[in-house]
Amino acid sequence: MDYKTKKNSNATVDIKLTFEASDIEKAFDKTYEEKQKNVKIPGFRPGKAPLNMVKRHLGDSVASDAINTLIVDGMTSILSKLEHPMIRFPKFEIQDYQPGKNLIATAIYETNPEITLGKYKKIKIKLPEVSVSDLDVSEEVEKVRKNLARKQLKEEGQAAVAGDIIDMEYTVCEKGQESKNSGNTSNDYHLGHENNLKGFDENLYGMKSGEKKDFVHTFPEDYSQNEVAGKTFEYSVTIKALYANILPAVDDDLASEFDGSESLNVLKDKIRKNLKEGFEDRVKNKKLDEIYKEIIDDSKYVFPESYLREESEHVFHNMIHEFKLPHMTMEKYANMVQKDLKEVQESFQKLAETRLKHYFTRQKIAEIENISYSEQDFDADLEKLASSYQISLSDLKKELEKGKLMEQYRENFFAKKIDNILFDLVEKKYTDKLNIGQIKDYLNQKEEVKA
C-alpha cells in the first residue's frame, strides 16, 4: 500500500490510499476466513467447509467487507507514521477499483487543533496589594460572635427591638383580596437582619410576646419577584415568643469556643492570614482572566469542525441542566426562546470557541513550559482538600470516586498549577495597598490588563 497526504489550513488533512493487487487479495482472504466460521454450505457443518469452497460459495459478495478491512488495516499500519495525527477515523470514498488489480480510496481527516501562542511572558499587569486592617479583622470577629450567639427568652412585657429573635404566626393576603391560608409560622426570625425585606421589620418593633398586630406592607416596584413587585399586602402577625440575641464577649473564651484557638490574638492572626490569602487568590483569579484574554487576543487558533460542534452541544446541554429545563434539541430551544436556529447555533458556537481557546491555551503553555502533573501532585492536592474538610484522604477519594469526579478534580488541580506558573511568569507591578472593603470594590470593577 502507498499513501499520500496534504495538509489543509482548517485542521484537516487530505489522504489518498493506493492498494495493489496483493493487498486486495490479502484483504479478501482475511474476510473469507472470518466468514468461514459461520457460513452454511450443504454437506458441511457450519464453519467446517474448506476455505476454497467458501471462496467459491461467497464470491464477490464479500467485496464490501473486504474493502472495509483493506482500508482499516491499511490505515492502522500507518497511523504512527502520519506527520499530522488523526483524531478520528474518517469516511473513505472509493475513487477507483479494479478487482484483482488496484484500489484507490480518499478521505479528509481531522487533526489536532493548531495553536500559535502570543508572547505571554512579556505581559505586564498592575494589581493592588491586599492589606488587612484592624477593622477588617474586627468585622470578622463580630461574625464569629454572631455565629456563637445564644438566644435568651425576654422577660414578659419587654418589647421587640432590632437584633432580637422572634417566633411568630401570621396570615397574609393581597390588599382587597380574601386570605387563602389559615396561617403561617416563622421561627427564629432575626429582626433587623440585612437580608430582611426593607421596611418590614419596622412594623414589628415594639411588639411584645403574645401581642397581635395588623398592618400593610407595599413591595418595591423593582422587587426581584415580579408577582409581588409594587403590590400591597395585608399582614396579621402574632408574636409567639420573643428572644434577646446574646453575643459572647470578645475574649480568649470566644477564640477557644470557635476553633480551639489558645487566645483571642491567635484567632485574630488566623483571621488576618485567611483574609489576606483568600483575597489575594481572588485578585489573582481576576488578573488571570485578564491575562488569558490578552494571550488569546494575541494568539492564533485553528479548530477542527467536530471540536466546535461537539463543544457547542456540550455547552448547550450544560445550560439546559443548569437551568433545570426539560431535555430538548437546540432547534426546539430556538423555538422556545423565539430566535432563529442559526442565531442560537452561532451563539453557542461562540461560547464553545471561547472555552476551547482557554483550554488549549492552558495546555499549550503546559507543553512549552514542560509543566506536568504527577500522581504524587494529585495526592498532595487531595490531602490539602481533605484537611480543609476535616476528613481523611481515603474518605475523600471514596466520595470523589462515588460521584465519578476524580478526573474532573485532577484536571482542575492541573489547571491551577499551570495558572500559578503563568502568574509567576508575567511581569507584575503592585500599586496601592487596599483594605478588604476596597479590594471588594476592586474585584467588582472591569480593568484593562496592560500596565
Curated annotation (Swiss-Prot):
GO molecular function: peptidyl-prolyl cis-trans isomerase activity; protein folding chaperone; ribosome binding
The PPIase FKBP-type domain, residue ranges: 163-248
Major subcellular location class: cytoplasm
Catalytic activity, as annotated: [protein]-peptidylproline (omega=180) = [protein]-peptidylproline (omega=0)
Superkingdom, taxonomy of origin: Bacteria
Alphabetical GO biological process terms: 'de novo' cotranslational protein folding; cell division; chaperone-mediated protein folding; protein transport; protein unfolding
Keyword Isomerase attached: yes
Pfam families noted in UniProt: FKBP_C, Trigger_C, Trigger_N
Subcellular localization: Cytoplasm
Keywords annotated in UniProt: Cell cycle, Cell division, Chaperone, Cytoplasm, Isomerase, Rotamase
EC number: 5.2.1.8
Membership in a protein family: Belongs to the FKBP-type PPIase family. Tig subfamily.
Domain remark in the UniProt entry: Consists of 3 domains; the N-terminus binds the ribosome, the middle domain has PPIase activity, while the C-terminus has intrinsic chaperone activity on its own.
Function recorded in the entry: Involved in protein export. Acts as a chaperone by maintaining the newly synthesized protein in an open conformation. Functions as a peptidyl-prolyl cis-trans isomerase.
This protein's name: Trigger factor
Organism from which the protein derives: Leptospira interrogans serogroup Icterohaemorrhagiae serovar Lai (strain 56601)
Origin organism lineage: Bacteria, Pseudomonadati, Spirochaetota, Spirochaetia, Leptospirales
